[in-house]
């Protein structure tokens, strides 16, 4: 559920759990940032979600939130291996230099270098590619890096517009 703060002119999404037969809801999170992409670990023991650009787990009652990833610049999605030995996560990768990379003496430049027909998709500029990374999952250790299984490829997975990580 998203709550709006008029003074800050923004909304915050929190997670709830609903007992369908009884119709009872339990608020799981109450933070000043967004939680999204909720799911369950394959063993059914923990609720998983994205918050602050990272993967988190918590008990089904909302207690003991634990950050699973600590990936620089954050992640966009995730999937656990059925045996929970690995996690695949999505992360944006910059492959082409930006104007600021090429011209550091022009830090305020708002230019773009376009050398491909696919430079914009719907309402987004294409300035990075979403790649799949795979990492070992050890519950007590935050994941700080993974293997880019698409390294150097100028393709995305999943393909825009995102239809879900299962693509």
Question: Across the structure, where does each feature detected by a protein language model lie?
Answer:
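Predominantly five- to eight-bladed beta-propeller fold
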Residues: 13, 89-141, 146, 151
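Multi-bladed beta-propeller domains
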Residues: 18-34, 58-74, 106-112, 136-164
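Conserved beta-propeller blade repeats
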Residues: 30-48, 65, 72-90, 119-132, ...
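Beta-strand-rich domains and repeat architectures in extracellular enzymes and scaffolds
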Residues: 1-13, 166
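Generic domain-boundary/flexible-linker signal
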Residues: 8, 66, 79, 98-99, ...
